[in-house]
Amino acid sequence: MLAIRLVHLIEKHSDALSRGLAVEIRKSDRTSDFRKIPPDELKLAATEVYRKLGEWLLQKTESDIAGRFKVIAQQRAAEGISLHQFVWALMLTRDHLWKFLRREAFADTAVELHGELELHQLLNQFFDRAVYYAIVGYEQAEQPGPPTNELLRARDLAISIGLMEERGATRDIIEE
């Protein structure tokens, strides 16, 4: 129960948390690549996590987390954000939450302490998965995809008019 109250506290303060996190990410030397991203876009990305934290922790499946963080990672990779800096930004996002909770919510009883520990476990589990799937997303962004139908049609046309030999065409497409 207390964990849910703490999540609601985070969601209620999501705008202020997001602003603070965006500033922290832009100032950190470990996340200097993020200076390429407009501040409002950084704040919006943080707000997405903070404002819907309850959903992410309690309702979203691992598949939901995988899908979202792979896409975000691929987008950041395309924007030139290095993987280690993206992972550090995720760690800053988690740590920023903990600083906020230490300021705003202190456990006075064993039950409250249990609630804080429960939230700590849920947050760590969420961010561990976010980091894992972000790395998967970066790896997928680096791998060339399979030949498209257009490439295959072009290859077939080149073979049919004698510009390519069938055997070499397959190897050329695979190597590219």
What positions do the PLM features span?
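N-terminal low-complexity or simple alpha-helical regulatory segments
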Residues: 1-84
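Long, amphipathic alpha-helical coupling/dimerization segments that relay conformational signals between
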Residues: 2, 6, 62-175
